[in-house]
Every structure is written in structure tokens, then in C-alpha cells.
């Protein structure tokens, strides 16, 4: 029996508003526990919520960027459940009239493009955060009432790789809109995954498992990969899949049962009595649409068409708005687009990944990188020397020209000076000359290495090759 995998994702994104969705409480991350709450957030008797218009604008902006249809009439509902981090015993969410529906984004895996549907995007308030210790449980209500959008995908993904690509693309689009920073480590982007298997050709979905507590895109992919194998093994051996909630454990590289779900949750939704229905007219929609900046796909196409970048470069550079904006500022300052792309995708990304940092955390600036790239273009420094300059720029900042002068890194491009060095090296390596003339191409590499060593890596490589061949041919 051949089985196919069905994957759908539910993503919660915290909106970057200055106040909470139904109160004036601040939203700063990292504040002391329970210092950013109010009687409205905690559901004291007699208090009434007031809808934050900026949260609605942000939700509309995200929905439009995800190609959703925007509702003309929408409303809020009470989702009833009891849990210590939910002091009101209900959550204000949206049930049957979400703010956005029928959206999609396009992903690419192994060179193949695929459209993933988005069922709905709705607004809701976040819950508090529980911390469990040996002495008991603690609850921080700072997060209670934070504005969230929940983005529910269609079950259109067939592999864990597609799920990873979907999350990467979704995060990129949301970051470009500016409505959220999507930092998983701070909880501003959270994901639950639903996965089931069914025989190829069957229309009915199999019984799904829900994966929770997935705190990175890599964990989402790994969790789905393990769950895919677990369910396949169970089904092929004649077993049945139970509807379960599971979590991915990095230590064991397995998904672990959290609880069995005997039926669907009954949250007894009913319309929120303290909030009126919301009507969104065309004028409001168009005002929000006009605020949407250039999104990653459009920017990627522009890089290829106008800057002549390869599609791969354009894809990597536009994955995050931070990197793309840095690239644009560097090129706008006069640097060559392709050379800038090479440095950002190579040395810069390697450094950031190794140090676990973002561009905003390092001393490198677009102006600094631009000036360094232009020094390479002019032949003032070689790419090899530029790495020494780069290390200084990204660690301490500064002016590339001043760094080159202070460290004596100016490339030697004077033909007379280089010819003298080449002649001296050849005089001391006659055997290498003979080896080269006898077809041993490695000999030329050895000679170039000796010249670079003698000039402390500052010789102009193309000029060295030219002079070296000229001098060898004279002998």
C-alpha cells in the first residue's frame, strides 16, 4: 500500500502594536512578570474591552499580503475554556467570520513551485505564560491580551520539506509587511502542525496527529519527519492511528504523546457580547492596501530583472527584509550588485550563522561594505586582502580605506615591483619552471604561492599570473 502524507499548519503571529488588542496595556517583551497587565486583561467584573484599531489594520495588512479575501463584516467570539494562564476562562477570538479567508502563498522546493492555500486568518488575544517548577507553577500575565493573528493553512503540504518552505516564506512575507518581527525565541511566532497519512488516491483524510511545542522551523520539519515514519509503520503493520496531541523531543529525536483526543474540542463559541460587529468598507481596505510595501517575490523579480542577479542570489537575499534592505543600501551607495551579493551570501552569512547573530547586532554597515567592495573593484585590494578588512569591519566597524592604510594592506599593482619579485622567485625555483614546461600545471600554483608569500598576500593576482607566464616564456 502506497501512502501519501497530508500536512496542515496553524501559525500564531504576535502583532507589533504599542498596546494590547483590547486594553491600553503596553506590549514590551522582557518586562518583569505581571507588570504589563490591567483589569481588562485579567477580566475583572464590570470592565469592557476596547478594540485596538491598529491591530485590525495589521491583521488586514497581513491578510492582504497573503492574498486573502478581506471580510466586509467581521465579529469577535468567546472561546470558552479554563486554564490557569487564561484568567477570564474564555478567550476573545473569531469563529465564523474571520477577517481574511481564501488566501495562498507560493513556495519552491527542489526547483518546483507550488501554491499552498490559506484557509483563514483571524484576530484573537493571547493567553498568559505558565512556568512549571519543582515548587509549583507560576503564571505571568504580561502576554495575556497581546494581539495575535492565527493563520490556518489548507492541508496542501505533502512533505516536511514543503512545511519548512511554507513557514520560511510565511515568516518572510509577514516581516516585510512590518506587522510582526516573527521571533520564535520570543514567542512572537508559534506553530502547531497537523499530519496524517492516507492511501494514494483516497480522498478521505486519515486520522491526524497534532504536533505542539515546536520552537523552530527545524523542529517542525524534524517532528513531521518522525511522525510521518511512525504513522507509516503503524498503518503498514495493520494498526490504526489515534487522534493525539504530541510534542517533538530533540533529545530522543522522536515525537512523544502528550494526550489522546477522543473527539474535537467543544469551546462553546458564542458572539462576544461586549464588542459590536466590525464593518470594513472599501475605503478602509484600500488605505491599508496602499501601506503594503514591496513583498519578497516582487523584490526578488526586480533583483533579477534590473540588477542582473541570478535567481538563487535573489532568493537568498530576499529571505529576510533585514538582509534585503542591507543589500539595497550597499548597492545604492555605489557597490556592484553581484559582488555585494557574493559577500553577503558568503562571508557575512557565514559570520552571522557562526556567531548566532543578526545584522543589527554587528558593526558592519552598508556604507562600510560598499566602500570595501569598491576598493576591490578598483584593484586597491584583492579579495583575499578584503577578508582581513571585512573581519575588522564586522567586529569593530570603521572606514575600509583607513583600515587598509593602517594595516598596510594596499594591493601591489606596480608592474615593475612585481616583475622584480617574480624574477627572484623564478631564479630560486628552476625545477618548478621545468615541471611547468613539461606539462605539470601544479607547478604554476606553487610559484604563485611563493610570490604571494613574498608579498604577504598583497600582490595583484591577475597581474602576477600575466608577469609569471611572460617571465617563464623568456627562459
Swiss-Prot record:
Transmembrane ranges, per UniProt, are none
Give the reaction(s) catalysed. L-glutamyl-tRNA(Gln) + L-glutamine + ATP + H2O = L-glutaminyl-tRNA(Gln) + L-glutamate + ADP + phosphate + H(+); L-aspartyl-tRNA(Asn) + L-glutamine + ATP + H2O = L-asparaginyl-tRNA(Asn) + L-glutamate + ADP + phosphate + 2 H(+)
Its GO biological process annotations read:
glutaminyl-tRNAGln biosynthesis via transamidation; translation
* Alphabetical keyword list: ATP-binding, Ligase, Nucleotide-binding, Protein biosynthesis
In terms of superkingdom, the source organism counts as Bacteria
Would the keyword Protein biosynthesis be found if you checked this record's keyword annotation? Answer: yes
For molecular function, the Gene Ontology terms on record are: asparaginyl-tRNA synthase (glutamine-hydrolyzing) activity; ATP binding; glutaminyl-tRNA synthase (glutamine-hydrolyzing) activity
Q: What is its EC number?
A: 6.3.5.-
The answer to whether keyword Repeat applies is no
Q: Which Gene3D superfamilies match?
A: 1.10.10.410, GatB domain, N-terminal subdomain (1.10.150.380)
What is the purpose of this protein?
Answer: Allows the formation of correctly charged Asn-tRNA(Asn) or Gln-tRNA(Gln) through the transamidation of misacylated Asp-tRNA(Asn) or Glu-tRNA(Gln) in organisms which lack either or both of asparaginyl-tRNA or glutaminyl-tRNA synthetases. The reaction takes place in the presence of glutamine and ATP through an activated phospho-Asp-tRNA(Asn) or phospho-Glu-tRNA(Gln).
Assigned protein family:
Belongs to the GatB/GatE family. GatB subfamily.
How does the record describe its quaternary structure?
Answer: Heterotrimer of A, B and C subunits.
The name under which this protein is listed is Aspartyl/glutamyl-tRNA(Asn/Gln) amidotransferase subunit B
Per the UniProt record, the source organism is Bacillus cereus (strain B4264)
Gene designation: gatB
